Amino acid sequence: AKDVSEFDTLDELKADIKKKLTEQAEAAADNEVENSLNNSIIDKLEGEIPEVMYENRITEMVRDWEFRNRYQGITVKDYLKYTGATMEQFRDNFREAATKQIKLRLALEKIAQYENIEAAEEEIAKHYADLAEEHKMEVEKVKNIISVEALSEDIKVEKAFNFVKDNAEIAS
């Protein structure tokens, strides 16, 4: 075991493998529960959602795609050229995810409102600090980019999801 791993004995190696497999299985199960909850929340959302909300989210997703692929030297223009797709087809690739995200966000905002879920000043400060650390920026720069209102809404949505998750009856 020592020759092929950082462990001194085969038993230690087996225990580590078992632990990692258990962690992966638990993460997959948690992910499945979250996806199921998301779908349940979305299914319960009623009312018309303006198309412009979907279009705006798709535009954000295209911008995110551009940002992620910029470092590999791939632009949307290049992608369209290589794939033979139109900009409309490219944007349509994001439509399903954008639709789910918008519906989920609206439903969770409504739950947060209904349950009087708020974002405490300490939570907002912690999120700013976490974002600053994650992006290797000063907190003040992050505050200039993300408004207190926007961050507060994100925190309330996150707390609303946790509220739903904590109160959901999950069948195994």
Q: Model regions: which residues?
A:
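Extended, charged alpha-helical "arm"/coiled-coil substrate-binding scaffolds
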Residues: 1-172
